[in-house]
Curated annotation (Swiss-Prot):
Catalyses which reaction(s): cutin + H2O = cutin monomers
BP-aspect Gene Ontology terms: carbohydrate catabolic process
Protein known as: Probable cutinase 3
One Pfam family this sequence matches: Cutinase
Species this protein is from: Aspergillus oryzae (strain ATCC 42149 / RIB 40)
Function text: Catalyzes the hydrolysis of complex carboxylic polyesters found in the cell wall of plants. Degrades cutin, a macromolecule that forms the structure of the plant cuticle.
GO MF term list: cutinase activity
């Protein structure tokens, strides 16, 4: 697996020209199981709506590394009947090559995420929106939030990033969005957070951060 990652990084480095890139999550059978949630698009409105974008090559629309654990932790803290979890699917394919684009993902992925924020605002006008992104998914959410109207952006109470691929470029925050409402998790040794193409084992460790991230989002919702 180490050799595979090295080959992928080497092959994409020339194309990326210094842009950070996320690599596949755990290749085990368990990690290949689908992880999806469509509480917003298919379910009833809840007090809180979590919109999450998975990392490159992760299955489903929530992935496996941190999406489902974050959803579960947030429901545990706020109540399962109070939280809707929605993964970003559609035009966001989680492909590796998209990491090399200027926004570290592609316009279709950003548009898909943006539409989910807007759907949450219109379908559920009283819901409080929170969001999260892992690896390439962090770039998806970062760019989507930047493009929201002031009205919708005001409903986004908190955002968490894991292995933030635009951490260096955007200085650990989302441009034109309150810095105090963003929490970035960068594991020690995760060089993706330093704006490099070097993917280490640390990039796959964010499952353990689910409770802390959920606590942060819950605190933003409760103080709103």
């Amino acid at each position: 697996m180490v050799m595979l990652r090295s080959l992928l990084v080497s092959a994409l480095a020339a194309l990326a020209a210094g842009s950070p890139i996320a690599e596949p999550a755990d290749q085990s059978l368990e990690a290949r199981q689908l992880g999806s949630s469509n509480d917003l698009t298919n379910g009833a409105c809840k007090d809180v709506t979590l919109i999450f974008a998975r990392g490159s090559t992760e299955m489903g629309n929530m992935g496996t590394v941190i999406g489902p654990p974050l959803c579960s932790s947030l429901k545990s803290k706020l109540g399962a009947d109070k939280v809707a979890c929605q993964g970003v699917g559609g035009l966001y394919t989680g492909g590796l090559m998209q990491n090399a684009l200027p926004q570290n993902t592609d316009p279709g992925a950003i548009s898909t995420a943006k539409s989910l924020f807007e759907q949450a605002s219109t379908k559920c006008p009283n819901t409080q929106i929170v969001a999260g992104g892992y690896s390439q998914g962090s770039a998806v959410i970062d760019n989507a939030v930047q493009q929201l109207s002031a009205e919708v952006k005001d409903k986004v109470k908190g955002v968490v990033f894991f292995g933030f691929t635009r951490n260096l470029q955007d200085k650990g925050q989302i441009p034109n969005y309150p810095k105090d409402n963003v929490k970035v998790f960068c594991a020690m040794g995760d060089l993706v957070c330093d704006g490099t193409l070097i993917v280490t084992a640390a990039h796959l460790t964010y499952t353990i951060n689910a409770p802390e991230a959920a606590s942060f989002l819950a605190s933003k919702v409760q103080s709103a």
